[in-house]
Amino acid sequence: PTIVPEASYTPWSRTTLPENVTLLCWHNSSRIAVAVVVTLAFLVEIEQGNEVAVVHIPVRGELPARLGPSVKALPEYGPSIMDASVYRDPTRFELERERVLGRHWMLAGRSEQVQGSGDWITYEGHDECIVVVRQGDGSLSAFHNVCRHRGPAIVAEKTGCGARRFSCPYHGWVYDTKGKLVGIPEREDFGTDHVADIGAIPVAVGEWGGWIWINLAGPDKAVPLLESIGPDISNDLGAFKMEDMILHDVIEWDVPINYKAIIDGFNEIYHVTELHHSPPEFTKATRFASFHVTGDNFMCFVPRPVSLEELSSETYDHHRNSICHYVVFPNTVFNCNPEHIQVFQPIPLSVDRTKFLCWELIYPGDMNDPEYAAYHKKTMAHWEVLKGVVGEDISIYDQMTRTKKSSAFNEQILSEREFKIAMYHENMDRKIRD
């Protein structure tokens, strides 16, 4: 996101997208906030053309039905009231840092970012700094980017290639790519017991779906990654084969709001009619959505408007005919269209500040192939629209920033279709108590 000087923006601009789709944008002087006039339903109808054989087409196959007459749309939870202090209590945030963010799996990046031996990336958030390094045998190692001597970051750069060792820029302590301390200048001046067999503190690391996941609890205490994701999501989300996709774009926002407020927006679809100006067809489709609780995580499936008449079929394929939405506790959201995927990750920086990442994944192919070129053109058009939709979300975060400490904001009134918000925070409460 670019901070635009007040005198340097045009109030309205027009961009012509493929397929004669027109997108109107209004640029705010403090942040580019996009008002999408193109309706999602119209774009979805455009997408329903011939399937492109040159890319992977996710299909339900033998997986359980997630939409249709035999599927219960909502669990029995009901409306509720929720205390608003969860967004602004600094003591609670410190407990979340320790007992939630410090014990659960979180995304650190894409596997393709560290393809070669010695390639590394860093993860920074909630006062932690982690290095992830590809080893010569193809495995990954991860450790806290903190020198054991006096505490500065061992690795200054956020990413790099082909490292064999890392040297702390302060006093030159040297670590190998697994975080083992292998060199201390003037070692004889240190107490032997103080520097024997020490190294950077290790972090649990794993790969699934083409993503790198880390767990700050460490290799000995972290639950297995796939156990945390759970079989329902690993199988259902796995049908999209994210490991075969490529990273097209990453957008980052610095948002002055609690990270859980961002997750809340992905745990309901009640807002899409008003905030995203969704037309009646899409609003109708959201009423047929199904919501599923699976362990600590959630799944939601919204049928595309053009497929509503097929919902009566027991063989309805939600992968090909709906938007598939997965929330992996505590802060990872997968928004899957059949053609491409957006991954949202709000990383807390403090109790009321969040680094909000949006990753766009597409299927690879040859741009010289007319079929793939058509797929790419259509997908990029949709991505431009979705960036506008996220811009609308950002505009609401701005409004929430104005009122987050107001004496009038003490509780939230939640409908039964917002039950995932209540359950998410109940789950957070349990993790803190445990």
Enumerate the language-model features and the residues they cover:
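C-terminal catalytic domain of Rieske-type non-heme iron oxygenases
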Residues: 134, 139, 145, 204-206, ...
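Short clusters of hydrophobic/aromatic residues that line enzyme substrate/ligand-binding pockets
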Residues: 108, 154, 181, 409, ...
